[in-house]
């Protein structure tokens, strides 16, 4: 076994076109480090609907030049099989380590495969790439990014010609095309590709501002708003400033330590606004400048977190606020959220007499909601992803969402209110919707399958003392590996994480609110019920 592994490693190295990666594998082979080689050769990175994502390291189980070369070749072969040879492909990249290199490698491979390749002019946010695919009429797009993953990761995200992420079976077909690709060193390359000008960012900025129509908020109200902001060491700052300026806002006060792109993300443990401590510097800045609202984007700026009054809002709270804002503006069509997101948005939509839809998890599904009669006009998921302008970007977009939050906050401030006040008003109108998670990390993945089997075979009949109905979402179309327990004012959805060895239960309880005085009591009761719901679900799962 050891000799076979060493031979496999040396064979991979011989076919690796990157000198540094080749030397890395050979050094491990020469040292006889079979434990590390087993990790590197445990199997190729899985190409899923979000593309590739993994640690930066040599070998088939890492993000490196050889893996990206074969991924680009597989993507090109799949596009060719669909009749797209000669079409345009747009490639973007963030500021993570080797992102620019992987973008260049992809351009060389796809150009040699017969595609008209254009690369974004510099590290830019993922929403700019998603916009460019549709704006330029490309047949596909590639974004080299690992979004909010740890610093040592990178990724390879693929968009179809409509500017949306892949859905099955395209991911499996591309994965098969990658597997059928020969050694990376033998993949043809060409320098016959181009670089887009800065006007692509300008076009994105103009499209976002046009879609959200800031002129509906008086100029004085926009200029009176104080916004604090952080890019979390990512690539969002420049584009976000341009959008805010074009919309008539003053420049946001930015966390200086986190403003410039830095692939080491030195001030945070994880560059994810959801993680504890990630927005501490933003909170301090917001207090220092007296910000009306504070916004944190993740490193590729496709998600954003909102802070008001020293409190970080949940994704469900922001999702409901933005839906309510658009509905009060008269934006009609389909409002969609993923099945693990909260229910308040649907209650608001129903009150306005508009269609709302629940989709499987992920923006790849949210963006496909809607009909000809009621096209998608808004979508969100609880993990801080929002689409306030799906006509511009068919994916989550933290920059346009940030502008939407600022416009909402400016409108409210003009009336002497804040976004927290509007949340209280929504609670009085619809009830207090309290959402949270039970998340269990495991070392042994069989614990997850065992827990799901236990829940399917013996689901609880009640939660919080209320009868609940059980639904196995694996039996629906499209099938989802999840179960739902739904009762009057209580809900639990349980599924394995798609990216981590975790089992997640998404929990919700609804507490009636009868008057202003009842808000505080309702929040206390909601917190208690959420704690009880966590305990009941942990017991039901045997965890």
Residue ranges and their predicted role:
Residues 3-106, 197-224, 235, 493:
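An N-terminal, well-structured beta->alpha segment
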Residues 287, 291-293, 297, 306, ...:
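Phosphate-binding and adjacent anionic-ligand microenvironments
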Residues 90-153, 243, 248-306:
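N-terminal small/polar loop signature for handling phosphorylated ligands or for N-terminal nucleophile
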Residues 159-187, 319-320, 324-348:
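Glycine-rich phosphate-binding loop plus the immediately following alpha-helix
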Residues 41-61, 146-147, 231-243, 380-382, ...:
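Conserved phosphate/anionic-ligand binding catalytic regions in large, soluble enzymes, centered on
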Residues 12, 16-20, 36-41, 45, ...:
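Gly/Ser/Thr-enriched, mixed-charge loops and adjacent short helices
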Residues 102-110, 152-160, 240, 302-322, ...:
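Short Gly/Thr/Asp-enriched flexible loops that form oxyanion-binding sites at enzyme active sites
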């Amino acid at each position: 076994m050891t000799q076979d592994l060493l031979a496999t490693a040396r064979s991979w190295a011989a076919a690796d076109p990157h000198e540094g990666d080749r030397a890395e594998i050979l050094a491990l082979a020469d040292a006889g480090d079979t434990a590390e080689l087993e990790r590197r050769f445990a199997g190729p990175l899985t190409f899923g609907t979000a593309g590739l994502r993994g640690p930066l390291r040599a070998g088939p189980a890492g993000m490196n030049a050889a893996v990206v070369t074969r991924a680009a070749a597989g993507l090109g072969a799949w596009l060719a099989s669909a009749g797209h040879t000669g079409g345009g492909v747009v490639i973007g990249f963030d500021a993570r380590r080797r992102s620019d290199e992987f973008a260049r490698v992809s351009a060389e491979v796809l150009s040699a495969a017969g595609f008209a390749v254009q690369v974004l002019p510099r590290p830019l946010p993922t929403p700019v790439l998603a916009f460019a695919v549709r704006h330029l009429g490309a047949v596909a797009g590639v974004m080299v990014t690992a979004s909010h993953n740890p610093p040592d990761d990178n990724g390879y995200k693929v968009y179809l010609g409509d500017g949306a992420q892949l859905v099955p079976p395209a991911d499996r077909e591309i994965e098969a095309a990658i597997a059928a690709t020969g050694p990376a060193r033998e993949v043809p390359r060409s320098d016959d590709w181009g670089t887009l000008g800065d006007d692509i960012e300008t076009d994105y900025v103009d499209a976002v501002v046009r879609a959200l129509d800031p002129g509906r908020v008086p100029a004085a109200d926009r200029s009176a708003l104080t916004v604090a902001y952080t890019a979390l060491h990512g690539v969002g700052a420049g584009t976000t400033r341009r959008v805010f300026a074009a919309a008539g806002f003053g420049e946001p006060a930015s966390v200086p330590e986190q403003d410039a792109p830095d692939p080491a993300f030195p001030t945070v443990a994880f560059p994810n606004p959801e993680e504890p401590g990630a927005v501490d510097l933003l909170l301090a800045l917001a207090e220092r400048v007296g910000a009306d609202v504070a916004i944190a984007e993740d490193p590729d700026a496709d998600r954003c977190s909102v802070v008001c009054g020293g409190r970080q809002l949940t994704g469900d709270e922001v999702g409901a606020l933005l839906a309510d804002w658009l509905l009060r503006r008269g934006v009609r069509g389909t409002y969609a959220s993923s099945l693990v997101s909260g229910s308040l948005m649907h209650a608001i939509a129903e009150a306005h007499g508009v269609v709302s839809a629940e989709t499987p998890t992920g923006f790849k599904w949210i963006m496909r909601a809607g009909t000809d009669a009621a096209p998608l006009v808004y979508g969100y998921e609880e993990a801080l992803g929002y689409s306030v302008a799906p006509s511009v970007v068919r994916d989550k977009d933290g920059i346009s969402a940030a502008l939407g939050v600022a416009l909402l906050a400016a409108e409210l401030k003009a009336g002497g209110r804040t976004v927290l006040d509007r949340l209280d008003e929504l609670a009085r109108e619809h009830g207090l919707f309290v959402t949270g998670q039970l998340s269990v990390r495991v070392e042994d993945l069989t614990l997850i399958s065992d827990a799901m089997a236990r829940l399917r075979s013996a689901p609880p009949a009640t939660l919080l003392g209320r009868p609940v109905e059980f639904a196995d979402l694996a039996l629906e179309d499209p099938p989802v590996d999840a179960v739902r327990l739904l009762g009057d004012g209580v809900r639990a959805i349980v599924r394995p994480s798609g990216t981590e060895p975790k089992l997640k239960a998404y929990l919700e309880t609804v507490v009636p609110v009868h008057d202003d005085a009842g808000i505080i009591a309702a929040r206390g009761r909601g917190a208690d019920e959420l704690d009880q719901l966590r305990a009941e679900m942990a017991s039901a799962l045997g965890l």
